[in-house]
Design a protein with these regions (language model features):
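N-terminal pre-domain/capping segments
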Residues: 1-79, 84-88, 107-120, 277-280, ...
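Short, flexible active-site-adjacent loop segments at beta-strand->alpha-helix junctions, enriched
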Residues: 42-47, 94-99, 167, 230, ...
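Short, basic/glycine-rich phosphate-binding loops at helix/coil junctions
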Residues: 55-56, 121-127, 225-230
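Active-site acidic/histidine proton-transfer and metal-coordination neighborhood
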Residues: 61-191
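Histidine-acidic metal/acid-base catalytic patches
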Residues: 1-6, 21, 32-34, 78-92, ...
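Generic enzyme active-site microenvironment
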Residues: 12, 40, 162-164, 193, ...
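Conserved short-loop catalytic and cofactor-binding motifs
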Residues: 15, 60, 165-169, 201, ...
Length: 284
């Protein structure tokens, strides 16, 4: 996989979840051979040995099980250590979700049925907001209780944690909560990681305004995952093949923001090369 990515002309790449411990030695050898840089590490790296398939949310800081929250912490500390070893400045982190609520799936179904402007949809969305607001702080407190140790460890290793926005409304923090959430973490070692596809999905659900959210988060933005979304919810598509308004959004990024192309494994190499070429023409 590394060889294939480099063959497309990339000189830097993100090492993501799904890489096993047994594969990391090969990655290190390829890095020594090709001298590529690692832009970021995505939690959890390496993949937990007890997990059989790629699952970045297999352990969450929001879990009601203390042992799962502790496991999430240990795995995050390991990811930070690997980031330092690989010279990666960032670790992208999922902070968890409210598993007891089922909010996003019903809203998605109604959008797919063309009901986004119906009274029924508005009623369901308001109910989702109210249900989430009742319990959100409980889960936020769980995250912060454990995340503080990871932030301190990242500081010692010279690494920043990028807290990523997610595509479902059960995620913690929500877009509304993000500014306050980050204020409760050390700004020297944490920041916001913007996923364009996830934000566009939330936009298509009527939960956020993509541009307004990105503009609001710009002061804490340290990196982003770039991919497009085809209506209404198919993300990880090459840029400029969906409906994400990159021409409007990219100028909102701070100058020193890390940018990582995050494609579906099914994406054809030629489509990636075409998207990168167009991106450079527009934004470089």
């Amino acid at each position: 996989m590394v060889e294939e990515i480099l063959s497309l002309g990339f000189e830097s790449l993100e090492l993501s979840h799904g890489i096993r411990s047994s594969q990391l030695e090969g990655v290190l050898q390829a890095r020594e051979r090709h001298k590529f840089s690692v832009s970021s590490v995505h939690n959890f790296l390496p993949m937990p040995v007890e997990v059989l398939t790629d699952s970045p949310d297999c352990y969450e800081f929001t879990s009601h099980r203390a042992k799962d929250r502790d496991r999430a912490m240990r795995l995050t500390l390991s990811s930070i250590d690997w980031a330092e070893k690989l010279g990666a400045p960032f670790v992208v982190v999922h902070t968890g979700r409210i598993r007891s609520l089922n909010l996003t799936a019903p809203l998605r179904k109604m959008v797919e049925q063309g009901k986004i402007y119906s009274r029924e949809f508005i009623k369901r969305k308001l109910e989702a907001v109210q249900a989430r607001e009742k319990v959100a702080e409980i889960y936020t407190a769980r995250i912060l209780e454990f995340l503080g140790e990871a932030v301190a460890h990242a500081g010692k290793r010279g690494v920043k944690l990028g807290i990523e926005n997610r595509e479902y409304y059960e995620a913690v923090p929500s877009e509304r909560e993000f500014p306050d959430f980050l204020q409760r973490l050390d700004a020297a070692h944490t920041g916001y990681w913007h996923d364009f596809g996830h934000a566009q999905i939330k936009h298509n659900l009527g939960l956020i305004d993509h541009a307004q959210h990105l503009e609001k988060m710009a002061p804490r933005l340290i990196g982003c995952h770039i991919h497009d979304t085809r209506p209404p919810f198919r993300d990880h598509c090459p840029p400029f093949t969906g409906e994400t308004p990159f021409d409007q959004l990219v100028p909102l990024l701070p100058q020193k923001c890390a940018t990582v192309l995050e494609m579906s494994p099914r994406t054809e190499a030629a489509d990636i090369v075409k998207a990168v070429s167009e991106w450079h023409q527009k934004f470089k």
